[in-house]
């Protein structure tokens, strides 16, 4: 049996390798983080998907209660589903929320149709709030 060993990758390198569809996973140790993991039976408490298009910086599509980073799509801050620069979102989740981060890279070629589909989904869902959190 072989044991796969993972090594830490500096954020700048991980962000430079980010492709549309990659998943970023975050895990913290606060009471809220532990409650989320217990309620969802998950080893992580926050997940986002990378959107990396053309010459734009990598973006992170995720949902959160926080409203401190301006949403790239809407141009305002709000709660719920949001599209942020990956550097801003991952930085906040690491530094402000004291979360560890992992990435899972997608293992397919993302087509133009797939990119168009995610942009349509973002257009439809961006800014959708969590129930009762307006």
Q: Predicted regions: what is each one?
A:
Residues 1-134:
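Cysteine-nucleophile amide-bond enzymes
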């Amino acid at each position: 049996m072989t044991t796969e060993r993972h090594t830490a990758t500096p954020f700048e390198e991980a962000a430079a390798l980010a492709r549309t569809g990659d998943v970023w996973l975050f895990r913290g140790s606060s009471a809220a983080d532990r409650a989320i993991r217990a309620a969802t039976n998950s080893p992580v408490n926050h997940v986002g998907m990378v959107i990396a298009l053309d010459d734009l910086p990598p973006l992170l599509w995720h949902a959160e209660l926080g409203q401190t980073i301006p949403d790239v799509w809407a141009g305002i801050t709000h709660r719920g589903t949001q599209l942020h620069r990956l550097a801003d979102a991952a930085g906040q989740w690491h530094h402000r929320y004291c979360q560890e981060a992992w990435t899972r890279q997608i293992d397919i070629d993302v087509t133009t149709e797939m990119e168009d589909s995610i942009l349509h989904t973002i257009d439809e869902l961006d800014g959708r709030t969590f129930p009762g959190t307006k």
